C-alpha cells in the first residue's frame, strides 16, 4: 500500500508522549504532522508500502522502501531506522543516492546524521565526475608538448584554463562523457563527503564492457575537495596490466593538483627512444610549476621545468631545459625562455620576452615539430605601451639570437613610437612619429643576402627619426564612399659605419659607396573610393544577393633619391589584395616609393538570402603606373612596365561541404603566373576531412600538400599528410597514422617524417592510449595532427551518430 510521507521528528514526539496508549507494534497508513513544526534541514522522510513504528523508537519500512535526508536518499526492500541511536539498516536491492552519484549493494548500515557506515559488495556510478581528467595520476592544469614540457607559444594562458596538450578539440563538439562506474568488495562511509572503497575497480566503459579499468587496493573519494586517492593501483587494458603505481592522487573535475603526470614515450631518429616523467606542482591558486626528466637514449638525461604565475594585473612564464654533456656532441645544451606581461592600468602595460639556446642546432636536433625546427631568430625584447582614445605610445628594446649565421636582424636599442588619431570636424587627423637607434649583434657578419640574388656587405648602424602627419576627409553614402588624404613624411638619419659594397650573384662588385647622414621630406597624396551595387538572383532553388563593388585608389608621391639612405628595416611588401591599396610598397621607413599610380579592383559576392552567409567572393585587382620606378632596394632591379601583376582571389563555400580558396598573381608582360595558392577542403561531418593544396612562388616554392582523416569502418580512422616539394624533388613532411575509437577508450599511432635544416630528415613515432578521458598514456600526437590536417577531429569528440 502506497502511503504519504511521515516525518521522524513528529513520530518521535508521538512515541515519547503517547506510548501508554500504543500497542507493541502499530501499523499505520500515515502520520501527518503540522508543517510549521518541521525544520527542513533536520527532516528525515521515510516511505514505503508498509511502515511500522515500534515502542523502542524504531521505524521500519517494508516494500519499495525509501528514506530521505537533505543530502542523500536510500532505497531498498526493507529499511530499519533506530531513532534513539540514529542508525540505519537497509537490506535488499540497496541504492544510495548522493550529490556525487549512486551506490548499490545488498546491504547498508549507516548513521545518517554523521554519514558514517558501510556497505558490502557495492557498485557505484559517478555523475561524470572523472570525465575529461587531464592525465593519469593528477589533474594538474598542464600541457605536454610532443618534445617536452615548455615549447609553448602561448605564454599568457590563464592557469584556470585546461592546458592539456589536446588540440583535437573542435568547435561545437565536446568530449564524450563516460558512465564513470565501478565496484568494490566493500565501502566505508567516513563522513558527509568521504568514502573509502576496498579492492575497487573504476572504468568509464558501458556496463557489460570492461575493456579497461583501474584496480586499486584502496580508493578514497572526497566529494568536498573533489579529489580521489588510490593506493596500490594498476591500470588493466584488455585484461593485461599496463601501468602500476603505489599511490596516485587526482581531481574529479580538472582542478589543479600536485602530482605526477602520465609519463610519455616515443622514438625519433635523432634522439632515439624518449621517455618523459613530469611532475606538476600546484604552488598556489595563481602559481604553478612543472618539473620533468626526459630520457633520450642517444643523448642522455635532460631536465626540464616551467614556472607560471597569474595575477589580476600580470602573468608570466619561465621555461628551462638543460641537457648536460650530450652523448652525441659532448656539449652542455640548454634552452631558456622568460616571458612577462604587466598591466599598470590607466592605459599603461609592459612586457618582456627573452629566449636563448645553447647552440644553432638545438631545435633541429631536439625537436620533432617543423614549426620549431625552422626557427631562425629568437627574440630578446621588452616594451612599454600606453594607449588611450586618441594616443598610443610604445617603447621597445629588441635583440635577437640568430641561429642560421647568415641574416642578422638589426637591434633596436631602443625604438620609441608615438601615434595619434583624432577627428577635427569632418576631418580625420593622424600622426605617426618614431625614433630608433639601430645597432648590430657582436657576432653579426657584414655579408647579407639581397632579394636580387647578390650580396650586400655592410655593418651600418645609426639613428632614425620619422614624423608623418596626415589629414583625410572621409565621405560615405550607402552606395559608396570617397576619402581624399594628404600627408607629409619626414625622415632624418644619423649614420655610423656607412660603408657598403654591393655584389651581384656572380660575386662581381656592382656598387661601392657609403651611406650618408641626411634627411628626407615627401608629400603623400591619395584618394580612396568605392561603389556598391547589388541585385537579387536565383540559382536553381536558392535565392542570393549578388554584389558588385568596384574600388579605385590613387596615390601620388614625388621622387627623392634614396640610394645612400641605409636599409634598416625596409623590404618589399608581398603583392596581394591588401598591399595593392597601400601608399608605400615597402615595409618599414627607409624606402618610400615614388608614385603616380592608380589601383582598380572589382569584388563580386554571392550572399544567401536565407542565412546571410557569403557563398562566393571573387576579387580581381591591378595597379597602373604613370611614372617609372626610381626607388628600390639594393640589388633589386627597378620595375619594368606600366602595370603591376594582376591579383585574383576566389573564396567559395559550396553547398556540398566543399570550401575552396584560390589566390593568383599573373604577370602580363611575361604571360606567366608568379604566385599561386590553391586549397580545397571537403568536410561533410566530424571525422571526415580531405584537404588538397598547391603553393607556387616563382623561383622559390613549388609544393603540393595532401592531408585527410577518414573513417575506415568499425571505429577505425585513417590519418595522413604528404607535403612534397616539386622544386627540390623531395618530401618536406610526411605523416601516416591510424586511430581507433572504442567508445570508452581511443588509441592512435602516428609516424612522422620531417625535413630539417640539415641534410638528414628526422623521424618520430607516436603511440597514445586514451582511457575515457581519465588516462592518457604514451606520447600525445593531437597537436601535431591538428596542425598537419586542417579539419581534424579527435575520435573522442566525434558523436556516435557519425560513427
From Swiss-Prot:
The UniProt subunit note reads as follows: Component of the lipopolysaccharide transport and assembly complex. Interacts with LptE and LptA.
User: Family per UniProt?
Assistant: Belongs to the LptD family.
Biased segments, Polar residues type: 134-165
Region annotated Disordered, chain positions:
134-187
Q: Name one GO cellular component term.
A: transporter complex
Source organism: Methylobacillus flagellatus (strain ATCC 51484 / DSM 6875 / VKM B-1610 / KT)
- Please give the biological process terms from Gene Ontology that the record holds: Gram-negative-bacterium-type cell outer membrane assembly; lipopolysaccharide transport
Entry protein name = LPS-assembly protein LptD
Q: Where in the cell is it found?
A: Cell outer membrane
- Function according to Swiss-Prot or TrEMBL: Together with LptE, is involved in the assembly of lipopolysaccharide (LPS) at the surface of the outer membrane.
- Superkingdom in the source lineage: Bacteria
**Keyword field contains Signal:** yes
Please provide the record's keywords in A-Z order.
Cell outer membrane, Membrane, Signal
Leader peptide range in chain numbering: 1-22
Q: What is its main location?
A: membrane
PANTHER family the UniProt entry points to: LPS-ASSEMBLY PROTEIN, LPS-ASSEMBLY PROTEIN LPTD
